[in-house]
């Protein structure tokens, strides 16, 4: 079998394999479509048999390989779920959709990276000739060099670390030289040479045509050899191969070199081929495509994209045609497109393998496009026109992000001839008569406009974990659905409940296919999540009072019968009811209502028993019909009807052995409805919650949110090392902002040792007591409540307070508004009215006996400048979603508090934690990481300010007038208040030098000869230095004098005692003493 037959055989085999893959893919689509139809019909499908997105994506990868893009498969899966009856084409799985809709169209994004024009830097090249202009700029990212070449022959190399300038135009990576071109010559120059050798360079000539552009082909596998591509005015592309032997770079250093050496171009290995019918304006080598590109003003052969081998033969090449040719082009690797621009003022986007038609166009320039560069990291394309107008484009959304103009200089003198983007420093560099540098910055940092997802304040935010999408509702009654990973808007619904009817709450069912909305007028609607179509509704009652039946909370309940929907609703008046939706009825009806127990609990009854109704229902519901069993009590407290006692928040908990509803009221009470124990009881009641005080805030006791915390047996079996909290403690110090000081640490002590010991104890305990999987018993649930006074409290079902915490933020005692936890209760999130997010670790705390020391706050950060109404934790992505009344829904990294963006921005999300730490424009506080001090850490006292002996203070303390003021001490009692230590003080900085009378002693030698000798004044006479215990003698003398009143001796006469009598009295009261004067003042020779 020859090569041609083998090639045909391999091609036929690949076609057969692809056809077999298509058959398997069609079977997968048929199976998934049939299952989605059954789910829409209400047929129960076991979880292990259900085909969710993860299973579907894994199956597609097994069929077609790992090259299938995640985003394309997700779009195909979403289309399949929204309309299983629609027709599907296999090419859609590869991203080729036939729709004309542009889902990327949205408003301008203030978070995008743009160029900060106001901080433009300008470098004037010293020594440049008059009216000289920079014709070429090349960036060498490996060495962080910037190379420029002027029209009149000045070549300059700029180094970010060195201000000295060296000359050059493009860089030969293997030879470590700079190559430049003139009209008829090639110049190779050693920019690292020193002294007179710096002017040594090689000239290669002659050339057949005028050289217009040059680039170097990187050859990492070749040593001491480089390939140079040249474009000329004849439409030829030349390739020159240069090596170290060609320039004699290996010769001995003793050999004298001339300053300029002329080399014959015929001695170099070179090939050329005519690819254009006009000037070659730009030539570049693209390593990602392993080919070179050259553009020309030729309208037929405008752009040629081919491998280097095509220069050596006459085989056809890939040609891209465009009117009036192309002046410049660039390649974007992530988007895999080539962008061209020329005199027709249109930027065209081309797929490298499709030369017949561009895949997109960018229109906006009013003059000819002269330069194009790309910002690969941010997916930006920067284009420059002949009028010095810059436009920054988003290559993903095909939209313009920024337009700015270089207004300095005249149109001729200051024309910009070259432009390059420095990815190392995030800077756009242009060359004209000067070099201008535009630093890249976040647009959100350079604007005063706050990010907004909706035009009005956000009322509801929900996360659909099955579709990985986010639903947001604003007070203007606009529903929007967003893609979590990209931030793109999927669809929106305007006025879902009618014109000017505000939506106040919403909920998503367990399967993720439906969501319900509730309005302030009491109406409820059920929608299809995938398509946004209305399915069922409950109209407003005729006798309803305005806003009395407004809905505050909605919960989907597990239906007892298939093909029906049950919704638990909380009204503004405190009523809790169940709304039912049947398959054959488009209207929703109220089938169950909970009686009001507040009138009985407020009179001191801590528990009210329930009577289950014996009435049988045609359709079973999760909660039975109940009646309150009222018992008359003799003790009744005075109840003020002015106090608001309505239910403000509720939560539902239904699992095996539990059927509970927890309620938090506006006056601070927590009520628990237990339908298994047939009782409703008071969990918590603040003191004076029923009394009114006009000087106090009536909302001070209000409970803003309440939630059950329960860890299922499956979660108990999981390892605690998978917890997000442990990863936060371990990885938070590795965050980029920690090294830059963007975080504020409360305690510097390391908790690694304590954490390791705790994990080790858990592992050793698990080894000693192996528990079978089937015998793991779940612990009873806990209650957590968020209070108006800023406290976070945790309760048992019996009403025992096990944790009362005031979260640490910049300002304490801030009202908490929202709570959220993950599926296994490892992390607890809370939001407050000042826009802070509090992240707590509760993984160890949930294990009995619920040690409150294991409840730890890990992180807090300012997410909004206004109140947070909802905080959501996406555990599979370790992200936090926050919604605020400022109209924005923002996304954060949970492990570090890094800001990722907001829904509604023009650019897609980059959820990977980068080193660029940014904040929204309305937030200027860095995240605060909370670290506990380890109990194993020894506290060592540090003395930062040493004390010195203050002679002036000693003189005051040693005066004789202070010797007779204190009462005497008992014998053998030691006086600890030493005056010497009282004479110590902090060092004072002298504003004048000490007096020196001798600056040098020649006889002492040169080592210490320059040390000055200072005069030290003589110490105070030792005669009056006090002794330890002298306080006793001084006070004893005073006692002797007071006894001589019968002799009528005045106190003024006491100093007239003789010296002998004074010494005798001192000897009589002598106690053990120590003379410290010799220690403090050594004797000085006279």
Curated annotation (Swiss-Prot):
Residues 724-749, 1047-1069 are annotated as: Disordered. Residues 732-744 have a biased composition (Low complexity). SMART domains: WD40. The keyword Repeat applies. InterPro entries: WD-EF-hand_domain (IPR051242), WD40/YVTN_repeat-like_dom_sf (IPR015943), WD40_repeat_dom_sf (IPR036322), WD40_rpt (IPR001680). Residues 1049-1062 have a biased composition (Basic and acidic residues). The keyword Repeat applies. Transmembrane segments: none annotated. Keywords: Repeat, WD repeat. WD repeats lie at residues 129-168, 170-199, 321-360, 364-403, 411-448, 453-492, 498-537, 560-602, 642-683, 765-806, 809-850, 863-902. PANTHER family: WD REPEAT-CONTAINING PROTEIN 64, WD40 REPEAT DOMAIN 95. This is WD repeat-containing protein 64. It comes from Mus musculus (Mouse). The lineage of its organism: Eukaryota, Metazoa, Chordata, Craniata, Vertebrata. The gene is Wdr64.
């Amino acid at each position: 079998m020859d090569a041609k037959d083998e090639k045909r055989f391999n091609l036929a085999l690949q076609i057969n394999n692809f056809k077999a893959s298509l058959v398997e893919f069609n079977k997968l689509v048929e199976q998934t479509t049939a299952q989605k139809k059954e789910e829409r019909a209400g047929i129960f499908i076991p979880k292990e048999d259900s085909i969710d997105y993860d299973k579907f994506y894994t199956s597609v990868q097994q069929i077609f390989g790992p090259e299938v893009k995640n985003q394309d498969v997700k779009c195909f899966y979403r289309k399949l779920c929204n309309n299983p009856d629609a027709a599907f084409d296999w090419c859609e799985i590869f991203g080729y959709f036939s729709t004309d809709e542009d889902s990327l169209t949205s408003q301008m994004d203030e978070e995008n990276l743009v160029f900060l024009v106001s901080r433009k830097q300008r470098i004037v090249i010293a020594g440049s000739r008059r009216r000289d202009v920079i014709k070429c700029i090349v960036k060498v990212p490996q060495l962080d060099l910037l190379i420029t070449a002027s029209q009149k022959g000045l070549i300059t190399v700029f180094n970010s670390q060195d201000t000295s300038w060296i000359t050059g135009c493009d860089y030969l990576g293997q030879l470590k030289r700079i190559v430049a071109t003139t009209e008829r010559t090639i110049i190779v120059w050693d920019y690292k040479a020193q002294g007179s050798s710096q002017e040594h360079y090689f000239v290669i000539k002659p050339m057949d045509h005028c050289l217009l552009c040059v680039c170097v082909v990187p050859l990492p596998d070749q040593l001491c050899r480089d390939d140079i591509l040249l474009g000329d005015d004849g439409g030829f592309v030349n390739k020159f191969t240069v090596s170290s032997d060609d320039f004699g770079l290996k010769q001995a250093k003793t050999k004298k070199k001339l300053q300029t050496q002329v080399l014959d171009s015929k001695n170099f290995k070179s090939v050329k081929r005519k690819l254009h019918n006009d000037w070659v304006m730009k030539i570049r080598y693209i390593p990602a495509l392993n080919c070179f590109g050259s553009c020309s003003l030729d309208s037929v052969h405008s752009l040629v994209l081919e491998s280097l081998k095509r220069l050596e033969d006459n085989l056809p090449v890939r040609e891209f045609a465009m009117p009036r040719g192309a002046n410049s082009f660039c390649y974007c690797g992530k988007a895999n497109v080539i962008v061209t621009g020329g005199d027709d003022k249109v930027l065209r986007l081309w797929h490298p393998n499709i030369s017949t038609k561009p895949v997109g166009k960018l229109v906006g320039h009013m003059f000819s496009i002269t330069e194009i560069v790309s910002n690969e990291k941010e997916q930006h394309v920067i284009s420059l026109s002949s009028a010095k107008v810059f436009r920054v484009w988003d290559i993903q959304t095909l939209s313009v992000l920024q337009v700015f103009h270089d207004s300095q200089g005249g149109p001729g003198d200051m024309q910009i001839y070259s432009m390059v983007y420095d990815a190392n420093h995030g800077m756009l560099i242009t060359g004209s008569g000067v070099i201008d540098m535009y630093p890249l910055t976040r647009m959100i940092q350079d604007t005063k406009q706050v990010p907004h997802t909706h035009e009005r304040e956000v009322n509801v935010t929900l996360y659909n974990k099955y579709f990985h999408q986010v639903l947001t509702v604003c007070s203007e009654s606009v529903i929007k659905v967003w893609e979590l990973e990209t931030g793109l808007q999927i669809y929106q619904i305007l006025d879902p409940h009618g014109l000017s009817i505000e939506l106040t709450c919403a909920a998503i069912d367990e399967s993720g296919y439906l969501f319900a909305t509730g309005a302030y007028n009491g109406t409820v609607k059920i929608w299809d999540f995938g398509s946004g179509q209305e399915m069922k509704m409950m109209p407003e009652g005729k006798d309803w009072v305005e806003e009395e039946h407004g809905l505050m909370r909605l919960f989907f309940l597990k239906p007892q019968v298939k093909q029906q929907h049950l919704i638990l609703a909380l009204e503004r008046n405190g009523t809790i009811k169940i709304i039912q939706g049947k398959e054959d009825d488009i209207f929703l009806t109220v089938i169950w209502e909970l009686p009001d127990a507040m009138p009985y609990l407020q009179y001191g009854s801590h528990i009210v028993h329930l009577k289950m109704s014996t009435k049988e229902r045609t359709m079973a519901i999760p909660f039975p019909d109940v009646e309150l069993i009222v018992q008359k009590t003799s003790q009744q407290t005075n109840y003020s009807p002015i106090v608001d006692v309505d239910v403000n928040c509720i939560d539902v908990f239904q699992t095996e052995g539990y059927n509970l509803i927890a309620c938090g009221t506006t006056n601070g009470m927590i009520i628990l409805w237990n339908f298994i124990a047939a009782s409703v009881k008071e969990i918590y009641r603040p003191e004076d919650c029923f009394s009114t005080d006009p000087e106090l805030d009536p909302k001070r006791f209000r409970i803003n949110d309440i939630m059950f915390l329960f860890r299922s047996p499956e979660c108990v079996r999981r390892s605690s090392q998978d917890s997000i909290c442990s990863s936060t403690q371990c990885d938070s110090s590795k965050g980029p902002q920690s090294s830059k000081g963007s975080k504020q640490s409360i305690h510097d002590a390391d908790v690694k040792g304590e954490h390791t010991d705790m994990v080790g104890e858990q592992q050793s305990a698990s080894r000693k007591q192996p528990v079978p999987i089937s015998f793991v018993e779940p612990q009873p649930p806990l209650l957590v409540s968020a209070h108006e006074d800023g406290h976070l409290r945790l309760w048992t079902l019996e009403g025992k307070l096990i944790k009362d915490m005031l979260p640490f933020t910049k300002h304490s005692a801030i009202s908490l508004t929202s709570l959220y936890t993950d599926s296994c209760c490892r992390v607890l999130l809370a939001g407050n009215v000042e826009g802070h997010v509090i992240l707590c670790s509760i993984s160890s705390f949930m294990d009995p006996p619920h040690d409150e020391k294991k409840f730890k706050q890990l992180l807090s950060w300012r997410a909004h400048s206004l109140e947070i109404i909802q905080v959501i934790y996406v555990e599979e992505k370790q992200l936090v979603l926050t919604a605020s009344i400022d109209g924005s829904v923002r996304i954060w990294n949970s492990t570090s508090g890094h800001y990722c963006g907001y829904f509604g921005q023009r650019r897609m999300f980059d959820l990977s934690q980068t080193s660029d730490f940014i904040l929204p424009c309305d937030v200027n506080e860095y995240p605060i990481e909370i670290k506990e001090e380890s109990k194993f850490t020894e506290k060592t006292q540090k003395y930062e300010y040493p004390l010195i002996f203050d002679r002036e203070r000693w003189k005051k303390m040693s005066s004789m007038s202070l010797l007779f003021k204190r009462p005497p001490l008992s014998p053998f009692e030691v006086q600890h208040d030493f005056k010497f230590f009282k004479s110590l003080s902090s060092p004072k900085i002298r504003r004048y030098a000490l007096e020196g009378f001798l600056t040098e002693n020649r006889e002492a030698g040169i080592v210490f000869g320059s040390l000055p000798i200072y005069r030290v004044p003589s110490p105070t006479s030792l005669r009056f230095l006090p002794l330890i215990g002298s306080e006793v003698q001084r006070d004893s003398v005073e006692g002797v004098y007071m006894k001589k009143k019968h002799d009528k001796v005045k106190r003024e006469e006491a100093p007239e005692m003789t010296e002998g009598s004074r010494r005798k009295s001192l000897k009589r009261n002598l106690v053990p003493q120590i003379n410290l004067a010799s220690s403090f003042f050594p004797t000085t020779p006279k």
